[in-house]
Design a protein with these regions (language model features):
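Terminal leader/tail segments of proteins
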Residues: 1-83
Length: 83
C-alpha cells in the first residue's frame, strides 16, 4: 500500500535518482508514464523510490498495483501519459 503522506518532494527526489541511475529493465512500464518536469518515468517505479525517501526503504512493487500508483500521482497533480 502506498503511504498517504507521500508528497511532491519525495516524487522529485525519486525522479532525480532515476535520472542518475536509470530504470532497471524489469521496472520499465508497459503502458503508462508519469510526467515529472521535462521527463517521463514508470509510475510504479517512481512511487517505489519515492517511498524510500519517505520511509527509508523502497516499496516493493508487489505491495501495490499500477492503478494505485497512477491515482496517487494524479492526486499530486502529475500527468499520466500513454506510452
Amino acid at each position: 500500500m502506498i503511504p498517504k503522506d507521500i508528497n511532491d518532494s519525495h516524487i522529485e527526489q525519486a525522479a532525480k535518482e532515476i535520472d542518475l541511475n536509470g530504470v532497471p529493465s524489469q521496472r520499465e512500464s508497459r503502458k503508462y508514464l508519469v510526467q515529472v518536469g521535462e521527463n517521463s518515468y514508470p509510475p510504479k517505479y517512481i512511487i517505489s523510490l519515492a517511498v524510500k525517501y519517505l520511509k527509508g526503504q523502497e516499496l516493493d512493487s508487489l505491495d501495490f498495483i499500477a492503478s494505485e500508483a497512477k491515482a496517487c500521482l494524479q492526486k499530486l497533480g502529475y500527468e499520466i501519459v500513454t506510452k
